[in-house]
Amino acid sequence: MSEPRKILVTSALPYANGSIHLGHMLEYIQTDMWVRFQKMRGNQAVYVCADDAHGSAIMLRAEREGITSEQLIDAVRAEHMGDFADFLVDFDNYHSTHSEENRELSSAIYLKLRDAGHIDTRPVTQYFDPEKQMFLADRFIKGTCPKCGTADQYGDNCEACGATYAPTELKDPKSAISGATPVLKESLHYFFKLPDFEAMLKQWTRSGALQESVANKLAEWLDSGLQQWDISRDAPYFGFEIPDAPGKYFYVWLDAPIGYMASFKNLCARRPELDFDAFWGKDSGAELYHFIGKDIVNFHALFWPAMLEGAGYRKPTALNVHGYLTVNGQKMSKSRGTFVKARTYLDHLDPEYLRYYYASKLGRGVEDLDLNLEDFVQKVNSDLVGKVVNIASRCAGFIHKGNAGVLVGADPAPELLAAFREAAPGIAEAYEARDFNRAMREIMALADRANAWIAEQAPWALAKQEGQQDKVQAVCGLGINLFRQLVIFLKPVLPKLAAAAEAFLNVAPLTWADHQTLLANHQLNPFQPLMTRIEPAKVEAMIEASKEDLAAASQPAGNGELVKEPIAAEIDFDAFAAVDLRIALIEKCEFVEGADKLLRLSLDIGDAKRNVFSGIKSAYPDPSALEGRLTLYVANLAPRKMKFGVSEGMVLAAGPGGEEIYLLSPDSGAKPGQRVK
């Protein structure tokens, strides 16, 4: 028997700035199924991951919410871990890139690259926010597209015309953080000399480590010539400071992949049988696989292997690249309710439904996967409930009723049993190759054969015939053994169903090798329902809940003014246009005798005078200070008769009340009576 393989597996690190959604889950479920298969085969497979916890976006969100960056990433990590656990994703370790292991490894790798001559420095001119006192990444700059003239476009590309450009080409640039007009400022940046590794990368990307389509795409980039990679960011920045460079921080994409190593190192400290160098050393005989989406191929297939090579570590055995998730043939949409968070799904549906559906659609390629919700319901109900679970539910009752739950060892259909055993190597080969859809097709073809044979034998009819009880037990006994085989084949995909089946079968946790054996003269436990059908109404409820998630997300987080007083219900333009707002000159302002809160304002609105009572006394203890000021006035508000006289309209002010009331005023140049539009 061959030695167990040593395999280290990672999924891309989710960013610690938001919730996990079903698009993310495609990758983690795919990776988890592959790792579970390897463990069932007896291999030493280790699955590590971590939250990607650095960057300006995290720093700015924490600032908005009035908490520290550390508090934010701790809360998000706890949320992520809960979602993954409930989706049955079984990491050996889930860490954070904001860890001492990652700080030490990132600094050590950088210093090795620097000392080997692979780091360069040069001044870079970029936009700087004078209000926030920080340099702005491309996505934190907005302005008018220099190509098509569309306003409110990001600093690197236009969503209207698709053009790409430098931030300095934007017209009327503004900071997306503060709204200030940015200024150009020079700063010293640190660069990784990626071209030093061009020859190695050309060889490695054609070594079989990548799918062919991915290798072809990388060849285009390699043939066009590699550029140095900017690996530094200026303070303020949430991350690790570069050694010997005060105020300079590693760009998030430098320390993020090193987070794979850091998570494994953290695990090694708790599992003495694991040796860090045995998996990461330059001459390591272990296998290393990264499961990633096609949007981050360049980081993992160019920068990452070059960093590892330059720092004296091994390179990945392979990158397993997948496509995006679409829902009902379209990009996930918040407004349609198809941008579904992991937790929203879990609130409505069994995670194994989605695990199976993804498995039934996932192949080796990088094509996008479509979650068609009608097909999802039909496939799960037909395959899992109607085929697999149906075998056990059909047969268990006869064994308990006719033989006290003892499964006999007869084999009334040797050709059928042989077909199941002969299918095992092909199913294993499909799992190994990540051809999950092929594995599921072959498993369901076996389930169809088992169900057809049981229907042909009709134990429910035999049970009514005298002298046929032994045959009933033989048929149902084989049926349960075939069900057990199917459970073994499906266990990497459906671990919860497998655990429930193991309890019913009264067996220890099943391994892949168990498909070679049969249960005989074996006591079963009472049968309990193993899986229920998906109710379409629950899918609809999930979609509606996702729309509610969008509505909740549109409300700002933290303690800002919109949280204290949310935006009112939407109105159409005609309703707004019906309000006649005018510029008014406050000619006279005085106390109102007997009123605790009111001031009387005498207004000039051009060709007319108006008398207004306003509850702003607490903020303006000296009414005469308002005389001569211009303000905004609602001119067509119906007059209101009050104890102290008639109020003819309303002046506009902001603030929560008390001393915090701020009368609104127009810019200089406005004239009494002018309409506000």
From Swiss-Prot:
EC number in record: 6.1.1.10
Q: Sorted alphabetically, which Pfam families does this protein's record hold?
A: Anticodon_3 (PF19303), tRNA-synt_1g (PF09334), tRNA_bind (PF01588)
Q: Which UniProt keywords apply?
A: Aminoacyl-tRNA synthetase, ATP-binding, Cytoplasm, Ligase, Metal-binding, Nucleotide-binding, Protein biosynthesis, RNA-binding, tRNA-binding, Zinc
Give binding positions for ATP: 334
Gene Ontology molecular function, alphabetical: ATP binding; metal ion binding; methionine-tRNA ligase activity; tRNA binding
The terms describing its cellular component in GO are: cytosol
In chain numbering, where does the motif 'HIGH' region fall? 14-24
Q: Which InterPro entries match?
A: aa-tRNA-synth_I_CS, Anticodon_Met, Met-tRNA-synth_bsu_C, Met-tRNA_ligase_1, Met-tRNA_synth, Methionyl/Leucyl_tRNA_Synth, MetRS_core, MetRS_Zn
Q: Which cofactor does it need?
A: Zn(2+)
Q: How is the co-factor bound, per the entry?
A: Binds 1 zinc ion per subunit.
The record describes the protein's role as: Is required not only for elongation of protein synthesis but also for the initiation of all mRNA translation through initiator tRNA(fMet) aminoacylation.
The protein here is known as Methionine--tRNA ligase
Q: Which organism is it from?
A: Pseudomonas aeruginosa (strain ATCC 15692 / DSM 22644 / CIP 104116 / JCM 14847 / LMG 12228 / 1C / PRS 101 / PAO1)
